[in-house]
Amino acid sequence: HDALPILQEAINVQIAAEMWSSNLYLSMSFYFKKLGYDGFASWMRKQSQEELEHAYNLADYVSKRGGVAKVDKIDVVPQEWESVLDAFENVYKHECHVSSLIDELVNVASSEKDKASQDFLWGYVREQVEEEATALGIVEKLKRCKDEASILYMDEKQGEIGRAHV
């Protein structure tokens, strides 16, 4: 299929972006663990695993189409944030950024008239709607936390979610 070389390059860039996302969320997991927020740490580790799965799935797709998946340079991720809220605001901003990257991939597939890739990538578009909504929901709840006890309660709840999906 003639469209694959152009898409292959774009998807390989996305593979690196997904791996960077995985590293970012793993770094956040370590940050939360250091602060004693085991629930947030567990939830972020689950998110890290999901991003790595995205990279694997993208690589598998390139291979199925007869292309070659590559791992490009992955930049260093932040290690510290100002607060729990700041970290989750960064998660939300990052998920919005990932959505824009996925949208651009869909645009490339569309311009190349590659229906199979469009179909494959629409799954990521749908998933990003959920990822953004989840991150924004956590941010909005954290903004309502007025004391450490309420943050600890949220930490416990996110931990239950993180452990349930590992």
Tell where the protein language model's regions lie, with residue ranges:
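Short alpha-helix boundary/capping elements
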Residues: 67-70, 129, 162
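Short, small-residue-biased leader/transition segments that mark boundaries at the very start
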Residues: 1-4, 165
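Residue-level recognition of alpha-helical structural elements
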Residues: 7, 37-40, 84, 113-117, ...
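Acidic/histidine-rich alpha-helical segments that form the ligand environment
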Residues: 10-17, 21, 25-28, 32, ...
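A general secondary-structure junction signal
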Residues: 73-75, 158
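Conserved alpha-helical segments that form or flank metal/cofactor-binding pockets of metalloenzymes
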Residues: 32-73, 135-139
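Acidic/histidine-enriched, glycine/proline-rich intrinsically disordered or flexible terminal extensions
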Residues: 147-163
